[in-house]
UniProtKB/Swiss-Prot annotation:
InterPro entries: PRC_barrel-like_sf (IPR011033), PRC_RimM (IPR056792), RimM (IPR011961), RimM_N (IPR002676), RimM_N_sf (IPR036976), Transl_B-barrel_sf (IPR009000). One of its GO terms (biological process) is ribosomal small subunit biogenesis. Binds ribosomal protein uS19. It comes from Campylobacter concisus (strain 13826). One of its GO terms (cellular component) is ribosome. Pfam families: PRC_RimM, RimM. The lineage of its organism: Bacteria, Pseudomonadati, Campylobacterota, Epsilonproteobacteria, Campylobacterales. It comes from the Bacteria. Keywords: Chaperone, Cytoplasm, Ribosome biogenesis, rRNA processing. This is Ribosome maturation factor RimM.
Length: 176
């Protein structure tokens, strides 16, 4: 799949007789789900929201507004693009889209520790999954490790230079 694509939700079971579906949001931006918003599935079929109930997380798509048609969407994953995400989702100061963080170099005191390969969210905070730099792997360090996305470990994120400056992450690597 195209690297410009962002997974945003999975469509769940039908609710009621009018074609409403349970929407399992996988993004941090529920505001993107609104009347008229356009998404697509893995076959590039367009899905336009006709109605959305944020409290109940129920969605009704245009052209799928009866039970039989809606059933064809159950268990589908829906996507958007990075461009549309940037347009429709507003970030606060010092916030970043996960897709912008993935692929950045992790640097501590001038040493490249690795590259962010994934981000895992848990109840407490996000964890950066780091693929350890080949030089460190050759020196006997683990192939990967996690860094909590917390102020005490993250000094700065610079998208222009493609780096996350960290502190204390080398200790995490050493003890992984």
């Amino acid at each position: 799949m195209n690297s410009d694509i962002v997974e945003v939700a999975t469509i769940g079971r039908c609710v009621g007789l009018k074609g409403y579906l349970k929407l399992h949001n996988k993004s941090d931006f529920p505001e993107q789900f609104k009347k008229g918003a356009t998404f697509f599935d893995k076959n590039d079929d367009q899905l336009i929201i006709k109605d959305y109930n944020r409290q109940k997380e129920l969605v009704l798509f245009e052209k799928f507004d009866d039970l039989d048609l809606a059933k064809t969407l159950v268990n589908k994953t829906i996507y958007t693009t990075k461009e549309l995400t940037r347009k429709n989702c507003k970030l606060k100061k010092d916030e970043f889209f996960q897709f912008d963080i993935i692929g950045l170099k992790v640097v501590e005191n001038g040493e490249i520790l690795g590259i962010v390969e994934d981000i895992q969210d848990n109840f407490a905070n996000s964890l950066l999954y780091i693929k350890t730099d080949e030089v460190l792997i050759a020196a006997g360090k683990p192939k990967n490790f996690y860094i909590p996305y917390l102020e005490r470990f993250i000094e700065s994120v610079n998208l222009d230079s493609g780096e996350i400056l960290v502190k204390g992450a080398r200790d995490i690597l050493e003890n992984s």
